[in-house]
Regions:
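Glycine-rich, basic loop-to-helix element that forms the pyrophosphate-binding segment
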Residues: 65-82
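Cell-envelope/extracellular polymer assembly enzymes that use nucleotide-activated donors
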Residues: 6-9, 39, 160
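Acidic donor-binding segment of Leloir-type glycosyltransferases
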Residues: 25-66
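Short aromatic/hydrophobic "clamp" motif used to bind/position activated sugar donors
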Residues: 87
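Conserved donor NDP-sugar-binding/catalytic core segment of glycosyltransferases
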Residues: 94-133, 139, 174
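Aromatic-glycine-rich donor-binding/catalytic loop that engages nucleotide-sugar donors
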Residues: 138-155, 164-173
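N-proximal low-complexity "stem/linker" segments adjacent to membrane-targeting elements
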Residues: 1-29
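C-terminal catalytic/acceptor-binding lobe
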Residues: 23, 159-292
Length: 292
């Protein structure tokens, strides 16, 4: 982070939901360890009531523009107004649940000195399948030369941002970090009788955005190639045969990062389960399999 700008910019389009926005902002303040390191850019419409922002330990700026903009245009407006070294896309219907989320997120970008990577948190609905709230570096966005295609009305923006990194993983270059224990609860769900809380898209808007996503596959391939030209030029030719973005979403394509306490708790739970199934013999067999 330079002395003249924040490390992280959070871009939050918001309209007509002041109570949700206030709840979100307060949850940020309650959980951040170093709030002076980030800023929040609220992207609002000129025909909406100006947001009332409570006293907060971080900077909040309001970017106002004409009504009727697509979500792609709203995000681009927020990005144009941002100053951070890293950019995170968010919604106003979110509650941040994890203390120290800011330090955990920023720490991940030390993994690769070039910062050409994607980090995402646990939205509690789509989880590791899709980067609902993606975090990208300014270096990466400068390299690919764009942010959000303005054509996307509401959906497929996260798919679009994730897809080049799924392509990289498909050719053996993992640059996506998934943080399952950093929880940004997305409070936009319906209750499914079998699956529980699930995110539900507007089918009419999705029917327009999905073909746009398909049509922009060559754009995303070009972005993946730009990254490979920088970090693994010998793999560039492997991108061209890719034709199905959703087929790339395989287990293991991401680097999963968990705190030590969570890993220990998981190990204890596995040990208890093995003991219940097979007593000490089952526990011993499970341990030897882990060591083999």
């Amino acid at each position: 982070m330079s002395a003249s700008r924040p490390a992280l910019s959070l871009i939050v389009p918001t309209r007509g939901r002041p109570a949700l926005l206030t709840r979100f902002l307060k949850s940020l303040a309650a959980t951040a360890r170093a709030p002076q390191q980030f800023e929040v850019i609220l992207v609002v419409d000129s025909d909406d009531a100006p947001p009332t922002v409570p006293p907060l330990p971080f900077q909040v700026r309001v970017e106002t523009g004409p009504p009727g903009r697509t979500m792609g245009e709203l995000n681009n407006a927020g990005f144009a107004a941002s100053c951070g070294d890293f950019i995170m896309l968010l919604n106003d219907d979110v509650i941040v649940r994890t203390r120290g989320w800011d330090r955990t997120v920023l720490r991940q970008f030390r993994r690769f000195p070039d910062r050409l990577m994607l980090v995402h948190v646990n939205d509690t609905l789509i989880r590791d399948h899709l980067c609902t709230f993606p975090i990208l570096s300014r270096e990466y966005l400068d390299l690919i030369g764009s942010f959000c295609p303005a054509e996307y009305e509401r959906y497929r923006i996260d798919d679009h941002l994730q897809d080049p990194f799924d392509m990289l993983a498909a050719v053996g270059v993992r640059r996506t970090v998934w943080l399952p224990d950093v929880v940004f609860e997305h409070c936009n769900s319906v209750n499914h009788p079998e699956a529980g809380a699930v995110y539900e898209s507007d089918p009419a808007i999705l029917a327009r955005d999905a073909p746009r996503f398909d049509a922009m596959l060559p754009v995303r391939k070009a972005q993946a190639i730009r990254v490979l030209e920088r970090i693994a030029p010998e793999k560039v030719a492997l991108i061209e045969p890719i034709h199905d973005s959703f087929a790339l979403r395989t287990t293991g394509r991401q680097i999963t990062v968990r705190p030590l306490r969570a890993r220990i708790a998981d190990a204890v739970q596995r040990a208890i389960a093995c003991h219940r199934r097979g007593g000490f013999v089952g526990l011993f067999r499970a341990a030897t399999r882990r060591l083999a």
